[in-house]
Amino acid sequence: MRPEQTARLEELSATLTSIEKVMDPEAVSERVRELEAQAGDPSLWDDPDHAQKVTSELSAQQAKLRKLNSLRGRIEDLPVMSELAEEEGDEASQELVETELKELGAAIESLEVTTMLSGEYDEREAVINIRSGAGGVDAADWAEMLMRMYTRWAEKNGHKVDVYDISYAEEAGIKSATFVVHGEYMYGQLSVEQGAHRLVRISPFDNQGRRQTSFAEVEVLPVVEQTDSIEVPDSEVRVDVYRSSGPGGQSVNTTDSAVRLTHIPTGIVVTCQNEKSQIQNKASAMRVLQAKLLERKRQEERAELDALGAGGNASWGNQMRSYVLHPYQMVKDLRTNYEVGDPSKVLDGDIDGFLESGIRWRMAQQEA
């Protein structure tokens, strides 16, 4: 290997060693064995909520172990790859070594960022709400594109997504959607996505082919656990049931299984229609309502701190990213200035760079 490549590889190896000390692969392996034993117990699914937590954590811990082992293996393999490239003596083989070194560096830096997540709720699963904003049918289409972006990111990273509710727009796209991304540290990673996302493109819905600017709002909440003490008395909740609907307002169910919960004291409304039964829809809607009430409580606490001069700006995420498809192609985070010149990759779920830069930016804001 060239001297600069050797130095870079040693640097990456040292970084990975530091990460391994934090993540503790032996402890992760032990936890995987414990969870596998629980998952193999036939009685596990007697409690579906607990079973979901066990299988989600097992998947996350296995993925964590695979990633650590893969990165360590790639570090060990790179000198061998370089030696073979030198024996080949062609430029293409040397370029492969350089490419692998760059990709390895990016992967290790990405993993390093997750070790920075130490907030009170960072390790939780995430509830994501997407709402179309200004821009008419284009905004509804944009909201659906954002939903696909996040679900594609989750799929690529091995995280299960449960869609709780989708409100379809009349012509195209969605008015709103609520879904949960399962897995450890999903809230910590995805919370930097909260705010207004702006799309600029030639509208496919405009007969004159004019450029259109559309907005959609992304809200990210931590999944509420029993330890959070977010109690919602039945007397404070109005429950309405109705038939699930699909695109164009078509009914997709013959029974009133969809559920709408209205929290009377705050006016917060939550709907869920994608579960199989009214009971399941009510339980899922209640989880989202609790998450919204927890976030409301946190916002009130932040507002009190702001009034005392001890807090930051609670609306930091607004107008946070622009996606420009015309007259040029660029996705840019307006907080971090991180940008990518290939919107198609970003919209297909390649958002790791934005998440990492957002997490680093947030840490810098908290330390300032």
UniProtKB/Swiss-Prot annotation:
Lineage, top ranks: Bacteria, Bacillati, Actinomycetota, Actinomycetes, Mycobacteriales
Modified residues (N5-methylglutamine): 250
Function: Peptide chain release factor 2 directs the termination of translation in response to the peptide chain termination codons UGA and UAA.
Native source species: Corynebacterium aurimucosum (strain ATCC 700975 / DSM 44827 / CIP 107346 / CN-1)
Post-translational modification: Methylated by PrmC. Methylation increases the termination efficiency of RF2.
Keywords: Cytoplasm, Methylation, Protein biosynthesis
Family matches, as Pfam families: PCRF, RF-1
Protein family (similarity comment): Belongs to the prokaryotic/mitochondrial release factor family.
Protein name, entry field: Peptide chain release factor 2
Chief place of localization: cytoplasm
Locations listed in the record: Cytoplasm
